[in-house]
């Protein structure tokens, strides 16, 4: 009988009619207990009829209707409250009070080495088109494990939009279960039976793969939303260095670019460039043996959202681990990939780039004119409109080559299977650090310090979104002394 109603006793508190589905993993039940008691799953000891519940199995833990389940464990912060209500300053607030005061988004509870999943979700959630598609997803549409993972992510996004800590905990537990079903390797456990730490890049890839199969563009012939907004193409040429062979041309698709970290790479841009021209040994039909080829790649389509992976891990055979390269590689808040593009794409990017340049020049002139004024502060402010960031015939593309950083996924530790993953996401002009369930404001300078070089958090995955051109709306009348909130999502082609 998978569905039962039980009583949960924690200290002096008794929670009646708690619905439990034993088809779910035990971690889902522990997430429910967290929602009721505030006790983190890793601090819980759950007992029924003298049997302790394990994290990975319901074995010997039999539940029946009205069974009494005992929970032992304390909250991380069981501090006595002050007897008198008094004004609190930001520096005196705890994490929950700070989140409420600053209207911070919900975090996701760590269910036992699940920080890699939490950080991935927080980064992907910054894409408004993806978030909207998940909120609109038909969870009854099936689709096997990919459909189950997409539905679970949809539920998680809904819970994070005001559902509260309890709803987020339960949603995260079901998301973990769906992730394990779609990618069983991520369900590996350590010697003690606890969930093993996983590579966040693998989690990112698995989630994107599922979304690619289940999210489609409205009004199209089942075109993948992921391919349109995250996918690009490369024009590739192969030239043999050892024989006079004809140049071989092909086209390759990508969902992310890689920045390989060598001794000479100090900046993201140089790491990306080095990947675009590389020597590769492969079989030569004319020579009848392996030969060295020069592979040259140029981007022929830019996606709206560009994912970049720092290739920081390599297999260390002696210790059988994916060891980490700690080298400092700087990355910018604003990224221009024009030089990585094919001549044909560069020509198509030029008109929008010229508009950016014209606006920047006009802003400089206005600033200089304002400084030279000897009169009051009154300004004429024309209402603004946001220009589309995509080509008219290619929704989900980037029409300028300009990007702005909107999420960073970092790793702290010495191997991909250990340490800790955290998401750092942009909110308007500000930044937030999403460390599992704890969300705190940080500065841009703190984000730029994530470039590596030590044991602090190192950038592992970067997510860049399109820079959106904001121009005066010529159809709107001139107004005076108007202040507008310009911290808004970019225009989207998805309804």
Where do the model's predicted regions map?
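UBL (ubiquitin/ubiquitin-like) substrate-recognition surfaces
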Residues: 1-495
């Amino acid at each position: 009988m998978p569905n039962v109603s039980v009583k949960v006793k924690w200290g002096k508190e008794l929670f009646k009619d708690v619905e439990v589905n034993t088809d779910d993993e035990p971690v889902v039940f522990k997430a429910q207990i967290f929602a009721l008691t505030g006790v983190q799953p890793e601090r819980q000891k759950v007992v029924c009829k003298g049997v302790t519940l394990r994290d990975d199995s319901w074995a010997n833990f039999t539940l029946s209707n009205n069974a009494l389940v005992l929970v032992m464990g304390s909250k991380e912060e069981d501090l006595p409250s002050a007897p008198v209500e008094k004004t609190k300053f930001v520096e005196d607030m705890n994490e929950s009070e700070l989140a409420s005061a600053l209207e911070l988004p919900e975090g996701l509870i760590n269910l036992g080495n699940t920080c890699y999943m939490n950080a991935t979700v927080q980064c992907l959630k910054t894409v408004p088109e993806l978030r909207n598609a998940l909120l609109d997803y038909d969870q009854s549409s099936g689709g096997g494990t990919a459909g189950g993972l997409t539905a679970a992510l949809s539920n998680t996004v809904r819970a994070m939009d005001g559902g509260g800590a309890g709803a987020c905990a339960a949603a995260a537990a079901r998301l973990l279960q769906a992730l394990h079903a779609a990618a069983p390797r991520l369900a590996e456990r350590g010697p003690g039976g606890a969930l093993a730490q996983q590579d966040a890049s693998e989690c990112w890839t698995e989630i994107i793969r599922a979304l690619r199969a289940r999210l489609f563009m409205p009004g199209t012939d089942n075109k993948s939303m992921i391919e349109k907004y995250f996918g690009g193409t490369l024009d590739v040429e192969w030239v043999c260095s050892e024989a006079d062979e004809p140049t071989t041309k092909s086209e390759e698709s990508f969902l992310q670019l890689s920045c390989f970290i060598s001794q000479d790479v100090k900046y993201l841009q140089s790491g990306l460039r080095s990947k675009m021209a590389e020597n590769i040994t492969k079989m030569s039909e004319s020579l009848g043996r392996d030969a060295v080829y020069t592979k040259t790649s140029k981007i022929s389509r830019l996606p709206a959202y560009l994912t970049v992976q720092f290739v920081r891990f390599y297999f260390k055979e002696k210790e059988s681990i994916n060891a980490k390269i700690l080298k400092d590689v700087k990355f910018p808040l604003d990224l221009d990939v024009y030089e990585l593009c094919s001549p044909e794409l560069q020509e198509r990017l030029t008109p929008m780039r010229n508009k950016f340049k014209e606006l920047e020049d006009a802003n400089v002139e206005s600033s200089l004119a304002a400084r030279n004024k000897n009169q009051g502060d009154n300004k004429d402010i024309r209402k603004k409109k946001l220009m589309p960031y995509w080509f008219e015939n290619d929704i989900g593309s980037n029409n300028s080559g300009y990007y702005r950083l909107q999420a960073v996924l970092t790793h702290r530790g010495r191997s991909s299977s250990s340490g800790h993953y955290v998401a750092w996401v942009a909110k308007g002009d500000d930044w937030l650090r999403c460390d599992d369930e704890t969300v705190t404001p940080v500065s841009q300078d703190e984000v730029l310090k994530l470039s590596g070089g030590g044991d602090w958090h190192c950038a592992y995955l970067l997510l860049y979104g399109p820079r959106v051109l904001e121009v005066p709306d010529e159809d709107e009348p001139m107004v005076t002394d108007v202040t507008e909130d310009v911290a808004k999502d970019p225009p989207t082609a998805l309804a």
